[in-house]
Amino acid sequence: MDGIFETVAFFSGRPLECAVFEALRTRILGRWPQTQTQVMKTCVRFGDPRPFAYVSHPPRKSMEGLLLTFSLRAPQAQERYFMVVPVNSRRSTVHVLLQSPGEADGWLLGQLEQARNER
């Protein structure tokens, strides 16, 4: 995992995003303890060692929360999906906007488990 300083710098001035990230990271590490995070310029990567999910700031400054991105082969329509972007005929990129720490729940971990298995 990257150092605390990189994580603090990435979420500087964004307390809600930081709280959502910590809840998500705690749930992911509870399910997959070998998972590592890497803080990059525009996102934080979750991998073990290959990446399976990314979190980033929302696309618009007026939006609150944290954007979680992962890839699925055949995502079923879900109202919690913020956006689904087809990459090709067999794969789509899924974006989920997390607006509270409680949204890092069992349903979301199931989606991430599917993304981990399909990469």
Regions found by a protein language model. Name each.
Residues 10, 27, 111:
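Residues that form generic nucleotide/phosphate-binding pockets
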Residues 38-95:
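Short, conserved beta-strand/beta-arch hydrophobic-aromatic motifs that form part
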